[in-house]
Amino acid sequence: MKNPCNVIAIIGKPRDQQAIQTHKELYEWLTSEGYKVFIDDRLAAILDEIPQNHFASLVELGKNADLAIVVGGDGNMLGAARILSRFDVPVIGVNRGNLGFLTDLNPDDFQAALKAVLAGEYIEEERFLLEAEVHRHGQIKSHNAALNEAVLHPGQIAHMIEFEVYIDESFAFSLRADGLIVSTPTGSTAYSLSGGGPILSPSLNAISLVPMFPHTLSSRPLVVDGKRRIKLIVSPENRGTQEVSCDGQVSLPVSPGDEIHIYQSPNVLKLIHPKDYSYYHVLRNKLGWSSKLF
């Protein structure tokens, strides 16, 4: 993180009055500390007491901020990450969601922890993203990025599809299933975990492939090197439409016969944590693991 940190962005789409209050408190505290603060312009109508020239788009915030503070749950962090990862701006989260795997700071007592971070007492880690492209007749029809996962699934609920999986152009397996979750280590505690996938330490350079309700007893999750390129060829015999969902927020339409190319993005998310952060403490706390015996 740039030191000294002069320009700070506040990002997030609040779902309730408590989250709105956190945005206000952050803005007031940071400005009182002497920082230049800009806010996600999607909040301009909600925070109408703040001068309009203190609002900017996510792209502008990414270009100009030294630090971005995301208020909300992991969903807000995922949405911000897909844009902010294009820029060299570190991100820290204030949790106003449910689990909050990616948002560390307590909204009721963020000042002390944030002050320490701004003084240089923090842990910085890089989380890689995936790029997902839909190819049709040799051309890219659509693409997007995902911090958690890219998921091939049917457009209709509870409708099986058939597809082939290639890893670095080498045929791996075919599958008749509800879909396939292609997950980063960051996403291994999200949708992938619900689908029976493994938990991957965020420092691992690996990608997991997790079948969704496969019509076979032999199908199991597969972990491959993070530099491998995944190609899914959708059967031309599939009925209806399919989709590739990026982080559950962006959907790319897929037609029978299309190819989906998934690979590691050149961009990374720079995630900032307080100095006392422990990934395994987060797992134990969020997933309800047992405490120490002695």
Curated annotation (Swiss-Prot):
Q: Which GO terms describe its cellular component?
A: cytoplasm
UniProt name for this protein: NAD kinase
Instruction: Give the top-rank taxon of the lineage listed in the UniProt record for this protein.
Output: Bacteria
* BP GO annotations: NAD metabolic process; NADP biosynthetic process
Please state the protein's primary subcellular location: cytoplasm
User: Is Cytoplasm there in the keyword field?
Assistant: yes
Where does the protein end up? Cytoplasm
Signal sequence region:
none
Q: Give binding positions for NAD(+).
A: D74, G75, N148, E149, H159, R176, D178, T189, A190, Y191, S192, L193, S194, Q249
Instruction: Summarize the protein's role.
Output: Involved in the regulation of the intracellular balance of NAD and NADP, and is a key enzyme in the biosynthesis of NADP. Catalyzes specifically the phosphorylation on 2'-hydroxyl of the adenosine moiety of NAD to yield NADP.
Q: Can you tell me which family this protein belongs to?
A: Belongs to the NAD kinase family.
| GO MF assignments | ATP binding; metal ion binding; NAD binding; NAD+ kinase activity
Q: Which SUPFAM superfamilies match?
A: NAD kinase/diacylglycerol kinase-like
Q: Which UniProt keywords apply?
A: ATP-binding, Cytoplasm, Kinase, NAD, NADP, Nucleotide-binding, Transferase
Asked if the Swiss-Prot or TrEMBL record annotates the protein with the keyword Nucleotide-binding, the reply is yes
EC number(s)?
A: 2.7.1.23
